[in-house]
UniProtKB/Swiss-Prot annotation:
One of the primary rRNA binding proteins. Required for association of the 30S and 50S subunits to form the 70S ribosome, for tRNA binding and peptide bond formation. It has been suggested to have peptidyltransferase activity; this is somewhat controversial. Makes several contacts with the 16S rRNA in the 70S ribosome. This is Large ribosomal subunit protein uL2. InterPro entries: NA-bd_OB-fold (IPR012340), Rib_uL2_dom2 (IPR014722), Ribosomal_uL2 (IPR002171), Ribosomal_uL2_bac/org-type (IPR005880), Ribosomal_uL2_C (IPR022669), Ribosomal_uL2_CS (IPR022671), Ribosomal_uL2_dom3 (IPR014726), Ribosomal_uL2_RNA-bd_dom (IPR022666). Residues 7-20 have a biased composition (Polar residues). It comes from Bacillus anthracis. HAMAP family: Ribosomal_uL2_B.
Length: 276
């Protein structure tokens, strides 16, 4: 997918870029696969902010995505490639021969009319989903499960991909987008190919208002807050933070401080840590 630039008619337009949406084939989603999506604005059930900088934004409907890819042995044909406001990747509507319709993440180079399949007997081609044990070493994959049957949890963002490096007993070695090498159960499924819409990372927002359309609120620096609101707050004028190292709003060290738990259960599955 290409990047569309704009004439500098205003300061906001001068640096703005968007997708050209050349791959999108329809602007009407499948109604049976839509669900209501209410605004949370970063609040929990008590009304307290648990995630900052969220709120507002355009109204959305949730698209029900098939991350499990468990419709084994039944071929499906790609009907449309669609935009999904809830994720960076595009989605593809699949019409199966038994009449069912499902959305999947649209891999790179997937086109309308192509046939896809799920299951251990599926061919190694773009869009097909198989157990990792059936995928050859060196294959590029996405939408990887961590537990069999739970549905894909890893490598789902636009342009991301992982690679199968080897097989060890009941585990398969997978190199993730971050560079981390991880053991995944061989019964877990993955989809062949790279996630599409790889130019998503090149988009420039251009103006503050466009971030608000996306539901993102401003990020205020701690140094301009009051002491009651942030460890960096207070002082006369532009004061130093008065700490040995920068702190989060909750008084924890930040900017380089490791936050991963020391004895996390999944550590034994990580063969090589991600790149710094």
């Amino acid at each position: 997918m290409g990047i569309k630039k704009y004439n500098p008619t205003t300061n906001g337009r001068r640096n703005m870029t968007t997708n050209d949406f050349a791959e999108i084939t329809t602007d009407r989603p499948e109604k049976s696969l839509l669900a209501p999506l209410s605004k949370k604005a970063g609040r929990n059930n008590q009304g307290k902010i648990t995630v900052r900088h969220q709120g507002g934004g355009h109204k959305r409907q949730y698209r029900i995505i098939d991350f499990k890819r468990n419709k084994d042995g039944i071929p499906g044909r790609v009907a449309t490639i669609e935009y999904d406001p809830n994720r960076s990747a595009n989605i593809a509507l699949i019409n199966y021969v038994d009449g069912e319709k499902r959305y999947i993440l649209a891999p790179k180079n997937l086109e309308v009319g192509m046939e896809i399949m799920s299951g251990a007997e599926a061919d190694i081609k773009i869009g097909n989903a198989l157990p990792l044990i059936n995928i050859p070493v060196g294959t590029v994959v996405h939408n990887i499960e961590l537990k069999p049957g739970r549905g894909g949890q890893l490598v789902r963002s636009a342009g991301t991909s992982a690679q199968v490096l080897g097989k060890e007993g009941k585990y398969v070695l997978v190199r993730l987008t971050s560079g981390e090498v991880r053991l995944v159960l061989s019964a877990c499924r993955a989809t062949v190919g790279q996630v599409g819409n790889e130019s998503h990372e090149l988009i420039k927002i251009g103006k503050a208002g466009r971030s608000r359309w996306l539901g993102k609120r401003p990020t205020v620096r701690g140094s301009v807050m009051n002491p009651v609101d942030h460890p960096h707050g207070g002082g006369e004028g532009r004061s130093p933070i008065g700490r040995k190292s920068p702190m989060s709003p909750w008084g924890k060290p930040t900017l380089g401080f490791k936050t991963r738990k020391k004895n996390k259960a999944s550590d034994k599955f990580i063969v090589r840590r991600r790149k710094k």
